[in-house]
Amino acid sequence: MRLSRIGTPKVSVTRVIPVRNVVIARRKPVRASNTDAKTWLMKEEQRRIRQKEQEMKQRLEELERFKTKVQKSYIRKEDRHLAQEIEKDLDIITDDYNLDSDVDLVFGELMQAEEQPKSLKSLPGASDASDNTDKSVELFSFPSPNLTLPEKVIHHIGPLVKHISNPENIQWGRLLLDLEKNQGFNGLSAVDVTRLIQNIPKEEKYQHMSLIHEMMFNSGISPDRYLTDLMMTAFSERSYYEPLVEALFQDYDINGWAPTDYTFGALIKVYSKGKKLDKINNLLNQMKLKYHKEPNKKIYTMVLQTCMKIDDYKKTSEVFDAMKFNSVATNPDTTAYGSMILMHVLNDNVEAALDLYDNLETEPDETILLALARGCSSRKVLINRGWDFIIEYYKRKFPLNEKLMTVMMYLTSRDGDLSLTRAIYNTIHESRFKMTESFSMNKNDGIALNVLLRGYFKYPDNHTVQSKTNDAVVALRRSTLALNHFGYHPKATPFLPVNELEEKHILPEVQAIWSYIILHYPDIVTSELVGTYLMILATRGSMADFNKAFEELTLKPVFEQVDNAVAVEEESEQSSELSDLRLTPLAIRLSSNIQIKYPRNHDIYHIALQACINNKDIELGQRIWQERGRFRKTPEFSMQPRNVKHNQDFEFARDMLKLLVNCNELNDACRLLLSTETQFNWEWTYVKPVYIMAEQLGDEYAKKVVRRVVRNKKSKWREEYLQGM
């Protein structure tokens, strides 16, 4: 044993520790058998198949829905297209917006007689085919892209397709006759016929519908609802097809179809053409009670225009109010507003027209502005407002035409601006001459001529005209006068070559213009023109001038006697006093040989009595009074409404009373008052001149007559009269 350095022996001890032999074995993965794997794979595949099937099913359903949607959309598009075509045929913007230069002629335009039905052979293009066809047309082998004829129709036409290659030269009558000879409508459906009709211009459809209807019958084609609508709208263009339109309407009840707005529109349109307001009212009631439909805006507008055609002012206002207050969908549009404003103006209710314009919810069109300006020309206090509408017309860049210039003449004539009236009238004819290089006048030119003559009658008017104070109008006036050239052609209207006329030149110029018209354009002369010319002579000419024109231009009345024999007033013998022909212009001498005479009516007698008042001619006045008494027996007077006859009689009696007072015939004035005491409402304002004359002459009897006449009336002037006694 060895000892350590420090003396301690080193002892080695060995400890035996037993070690357990631990074996950690790696766990092997459990592997599925082949059968389980196949089952799992099969289920997984089935799941994926089911998923794909579900996806495919969803896609198929989506495609089916899309297909259905496309089909419905196409059908709706077709329906909408057909509806639009029918609606186009029901367009209600008719002749009452094609105004002449004078809006007062609207009724004349609307009341024009319609043409009578024509036979098929007399229709344009209905003659047999001719071999002399245009070679350029034959070069085309297919219809124009503007035409959408059904393929079957094109096949039936065959070589005749050249007739429809140029849409501007289509002879529909000839084409349909050739089609009838070549299989007609055999093999065609109602839709094919509908598309064929849609290609025919609206204004020609009604001419060919009889032949089309016959071919449909021969081919056994039963019209569907759309084709029936289209046929109704085509036939509704003429009032004499009313029974046929009504028969087609009965097919709706027979087939169980629900009438559409277009169906009712066609019926109302044909009733409107015939001015059958009662039938329209019955149909509107049926729409509400039987079919539970409210009239739409177009139907209301057609009813509105029908009321205008028959000059039923009250009914027109009622229809317009119904449009305003029924619903938002029927609110009047510009067309309806224009119709109502025009109706107000035509019935001298300008204030109502202005109120309507102030409440206008749409932009005004040219018709509205011109109608309002024309209406304002009837009131002196509204002249400036009328010019505002003209300036608005210019700002909106509406066409500058004769219609506008004629309305401007109304304003200048009423305002007493003769210089501008003459310049505008001359500009109208100078512009027309520069465009056509010829002189011509028609009936419408008589309107502007009448306005021009009124300008002479109202000039001078001791007030400052609006065209000299309104800044915008001043510029227009200045340019018009500066560009005016009276001597643009030797055959032009014979104006004196000056813009400003002197008083002494007015009557000679009027007489020269009248002779010029009688010599060159006697066809445009009307009774209104004759009346205006006579009024100028009554106020500016001598009694001799008036008497001469009165006898030359008017005819005495024809009236029925008790024994039923017709009596004619004898024409007075021409005066033996001949005027100095050397001092009479050649045109006036020539025009005096042209016989243009119009029967005397109330207006002519009123003018004649005014001439007697101005010239204090009691003798002629008494003859006029007696002659008018015989005129009252004529059909022209007796056929008028009772209130019209009463008003005309009262107006003439007031004129006669004024003549008697002016001629100091106090006793005759009293006899007139007593003889008509119970017939007329003699208010103080009418009899005041008689009382003043009686006061001046100290005639107590005449004063007593005036008191009696006034006291027997419930006059609003009675208190004023009693206070002034």
Swiss-Prot record:
<keyword id="KW-0508">mRNA splicing</keyword>
<dbReference type="GO" id="GO:0006397">
    <property type="term" value="P:mRNA processing"/>
</dbReference>
<feature type="repeat" description="PPR 3">
    <location>
        <begin position="260"/>
        <end position="290"/>
    </location>
</feature>
<feature type="repeat" description="PPR 2">
    <location>
        <begin position="224"/>
        <end position="259"/>
    </location>
</feature>
<comment type="subunit">
    <text>Binds to mitochondrial small subunit 15S rRNA.</text>
</comment>
<protein>
    <recommendedName>
        <fullName>Mitochondrial 15S rRNA processing factor CCM1</fullName>
    </recommendedName>
</protein>
<keyword id="KW-0677">Repeat</keyword>
<comment type="function">
    <text>Regulates mitochondrial small subunit maturation by controlling 15S rRNA 5'-end processing. Localizes to the 5' precursor of the 15S rRNA in a position that is subsequently occupied by mS47 in the mature yeast mtSSU. Uses structure and sequence-specific RNA recognition, binding to a single-stranded region of the precursor and specifically recognizing bases -6 to -1. The exchange of Ccm1 for mS47 is coupled to the irreversible removal of precursor rRNA that is accompanied by conformational changes of the mitoribosomal proteins uS5m and mS26.</text>
</comment>
<feature type="repeat" description="PPR 6">
    <location>
        <begin position="401"/>
        <end position="435"/>
    </location>
</feature>
<keyword id="KW-0507">mRNA processing</keyword>
<dbReference type="GO" id="GO:0005739">
    <property type="term" value="C:mitochondrion"/>
</dbReference>
<dbReference type="InterPro" id="IPR011990">
    <property type="entry name" value="TPR-like_helical_dom_sf"/>
</dbReference>
<feature type="repeat" description="PPR 1">
    <location>
        <begin position="189"/>
        <end position="223"/>
    </location>
</feature>
<feature type="transit peptide" description="Mitochondrion">
    <location>
        <begin position="1"/>
        <end position="21"/>
    </location>
</feature>
<feature type="repeat" description="PPR 5">
    <location>
        <begin position="333"/>
        <end position="363"/>
    </location>
</feature>
<dbReference type="GO" id="GO:0008380">
    <property type="term" value="P:RNA splicing"/>
</dbReference>
<comment type="similarity">
    <text>Belongs to the CCM1 family.</text>
</comment>
<feature type="repeat" description="PPR 7">
    <location>
        <begin position="601"/>
        <end position="635"/>
    </location>
</feature>
<keyword id="KW-0496">Mitochondrion</keyword>
<feature type="repeat" description="PPR 4">
    <location>
        <begin position="296"/>
        <end position="330"/>
    </location>
</feature>
<keyword id="KW-0809">Transit peptide</keyword>
